[in-house]
């Protein structure tokens, strides 16, 4: 209250003046405690309280008046008051610390800013984040809330002022107790009290500097008050412009009901005006910084004056004044200056309260003459009584102080020069306080005029609230439509998730298909190996057929030889006929025998020709079968190549399906992003509809909103079509996958059928080859029998000795054949047992080789471990201290190590020999197997030997 300083809307801690002391308290409590703890003697703080905008009584009266007029909700604004510093308070201004380019519309009545408090970092100079729609659409809302916000700020100011009063009372009591104790101590025992007074003097000098800083802060507050007045004037000018706009819009609404109230041009114009005001505030901020620099220079001049005053006082003290007299003189001057300052402050408070009472009475008559309320009048009467009682108490205190001042003046022994200087300072402070009072009066007049304009705008606000309620209904309808669209979007999202799951399943199926394709490729390799084996078998069969053809040719040559023998026999018979003419009967018998032989020969020839034809037919059939088999093999190879190509196509198709799935995922993501963008656009439209100032009829009739809604619906329909197209495409891909799977299954079936066919054909061919062998053997036996019969007949025709020889030979031949057959059976059985034994032997050799290698490895490892152990022992012994023993032990260990190294070398040589033997055995076995494979069968050998 006495010297309290309140800063108005400081920008940042960095925007403070550089000369401000960092110890200067930000809260008013600490400031009052420091300024009024002992009461300084300087007159710089006179009129320091004149920078305040409203007194406590005026605040209480306004609070009571507004409290009875309507409900107040402290809970809605307690957070704002708690966050803001208590040292930043002005009328109609926000308690928050905002930059100079920003106004809190919760305090003022600016129509072009949102009604809620905006953070300082979002509304800086050059960054206007508020849209033009919100600037114009929230005018009635801000006008409605201006009163409530001012009431809340006034309540907070009232609470702070009450706290300050309590603190100041306590400080005054403490000061009085200190002064009384100091006076008593000076009277009783002054020598130790002088030391205390010197310490007090030092404290007073420091407090004088603090008061000077507070005086500078008061000057800054005055400048801020001027800036607030300018801001209020700007706001009033903006309100006038808005009133003109409202009038123009109302006139245009009567003439053209379909046209909207506020066009984009008006919004742009208001936005430009808002930017211009921000620029003006920026310029004001610069001027404020310049004023702070000036204040800094003034502070320096004041410090120089204080130093000169201190020097003069020291000179006066050094001239011969007694310490006690100077101390008493200084104490009296201090008390006198403090009392005069207090009186001046009380006078200013009385004047302010009288003015405030008059203004409150005028406001009471003006606001409540139409609708008087008993509760409001009672509250105002109580407030007035409180004010009167406070005024009377203050007048009594003022009289007491005046009496005290007179007593001090009469008792005091102040020097004339100091009194003149103090009087000059008092006059300067009084003139400055009068100037500030005039400024405050102007501000109050502006505020009263603004209240009248607010009342005028409230009538307009009621008309706009009805329109706003209609627009709210329309917004609710739009909200319902938006919720429906959001539900559709959610359904689409679920469908998209389902599609993703299906795509993942398809990817797993594709992976399975790739695995199956790999398995098919492996099966194809195995089938190719089997086909290669079949080709080898066919080559073997062809070789056998060639051998049979050679045998047939040999048989034909033998038949030719037999015919030659027959012709020779005939010649002998003819010679015998010529020689033995006597034996006709023998000749006839011989002729008959010859005829029989010729018949048998012809029959044999016919049978031979028939056999040759049958053999040729069988050979032709075999050749045809071979050709068919080759064709089938080529067909199988073609099918395999086709299957390989189809497998490659399937892989490419699977990769294309995977790429298409990825494309679908990206497309679905783009669709989701587009849906989110459309949702954001819908939300923006909703906010625009909320902030719009038009009525529901104009909003429904406005073509822009309907077009926007239709456009959104069209876009949603388009997105639905795109999602349906994506669904159809996914279904198409699924069908393609099913077709591919069916084709793969068909091809698998075909491959299995071909494998079964090839196996059957191989079996049939083996059977045919076996039948051919059997037939050949039977034919050979038959031909041999026939030849034997022919020989017998020839031998019977010849001498009996020859017959006996032929019979013996035939018997020997049969025995040899039987022996050969038994030998063949034995040979086959022995070959089988030999093969089994060879396999068993190879297995045993492999096991023996493994065991030997393991044993050699174990021995080598054991030897290496022993050698490493010996090396470690040798190293330890070499490191030990005793030399003789260690040398002997080292030598013994080295001998053992050499022996182990020799054993290791021998083991490695044995292992190398074993590996070489194994290699030679394998090489010998492979060469032997090749020889056995290329060696002809014993049947062939026998047949060739027989017919050689």
Swiss-Prot record:
Keywords: Acetylation, Cell junction, Cell projection, Coiled coil, Cytoplasm, Cytoskeleton, Golgi apparatus, Membrane, Phosphoprotein, Protein transport, Synapse, Transport. This is ELKS/Rab6-interacting/CAST family member 1. The modification Phosphoserine is found at residues 17, 21, 37, 55, 75, 94, 796, 937. It comes from the Eukaryota. The keyword Acetylation applies. The modification N6-acetyllysine is found at residue 10. The lineage of its organism: Eukaryota, Metazoa, Chordata, Craniata, Vertebrata. Residues 773-796 have a biased composition (Basic and acidic residues). Residues 13-28 have a biased composition (Low complexity). Changing residue 948 to L: Weakens RIMS1 and abolishes RIMS2 binding.
